[in-house]
């Protein structure tokens, strides 16, 4: 699981021995290193894809690929119960609520959470009574989060419960990844804030490794900017605050995100 180089090696060995192979699921060739699609052809007879934009990429490389859908689409109710999620979390149904999801790895937390917390502090000055929730994926993450939160008022660290926090929240501030897809399925307005190391970013830019105009799945799937993406130097407390404030103040913009 989540070891594509190892798995593809095993698949290639099996395929060379005459065993038909299926690769489940496709790596993110839509985002970067599209050339991996051609390499997968040597290992897999068929690739199962979570997203509809992936099979056409494989078709360009002569690979049989099928869109099967994402399991999160079945795991999250079509109409999430916001009030029920708030009651389950012990939150008032009428209080403004912001969820922060800086990532589930310690490096992501230490890199992104301080900026997210500064943005939340600025937002509390604009949104009276704003409460903040930060789900922690495990005990290590909780310790890292608690070491950073300082004296930010009205903040709770949760043990897991990320999906419940998203459903309960008015707005989600997150660092992209699968969490953005989850927030979309929870029908929550969101702001994407993300930074990678300067060296990694320079390499990605220099070699043109990033193929998509967007990095978050809601925007990639829509083919347009539905939610703001603030990346690298644009990912500042002031910019995040402005984007979050927009969602809290513009009910029409929030309503436009909801399916009819």
Where are these regions (language model features)?
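Nucleotide-activated sugar donor-binding and catalytic core shared by glycosyltransferases
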Residues: 1-260
């Amino acid at each position: 699981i989540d070891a594509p180089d190892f798995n593809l090696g095993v698949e290639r060995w099996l395929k060379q021995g005459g065993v038909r192979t299926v690769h489940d699921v496709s790596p993110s060739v839509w985002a970067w290193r599209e050339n991996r699609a051609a390499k997968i052809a040597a290992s897999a007879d068929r690739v199962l894809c979570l997203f509809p934009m992936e099979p056409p990429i494989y078709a360009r490389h002569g690979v049989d690929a099928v869109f099967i859908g994402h399991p999160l689409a079945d795991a999250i109710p079509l109409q999430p119960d916001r009030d029920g999620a708030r009651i389950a979390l012990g939150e008032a149904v009428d209080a403004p609520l912001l969820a922060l999801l800086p990532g589930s790895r310690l490096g992501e937390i230490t890199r992104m959470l301080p900026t997210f917390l500064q943005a939340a502090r600025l937002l509390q000055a604009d949104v009276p009574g704003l409460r903040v929730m930060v789900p922690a994926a495990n005990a290590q993450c909780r310790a890292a989060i608690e070491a950073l939160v300082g004296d930010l008022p009205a903040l709770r660290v949760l043990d897991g419960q990320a999906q419940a926090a998203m459903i309960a929240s008015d707005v989600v501030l997150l660092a992209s990844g699968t969490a953005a897809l989850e927030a979309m399925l929870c029908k929550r307005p969101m702001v994407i804030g993300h930074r990678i190391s300067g060296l990694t970013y320079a390499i990605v830019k220099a070699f043109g490794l990033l193929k998509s105009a967007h990095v978050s799945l809601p925007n990639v799937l829509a083919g347009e900017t539905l939610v703001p993406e603030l990346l690298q130097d644009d990912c500042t407390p002031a910019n995040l605050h402005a984007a979050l404030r927009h969602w809290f103040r513009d009910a029409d913009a929030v309503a436009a995100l909801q399916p009819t």
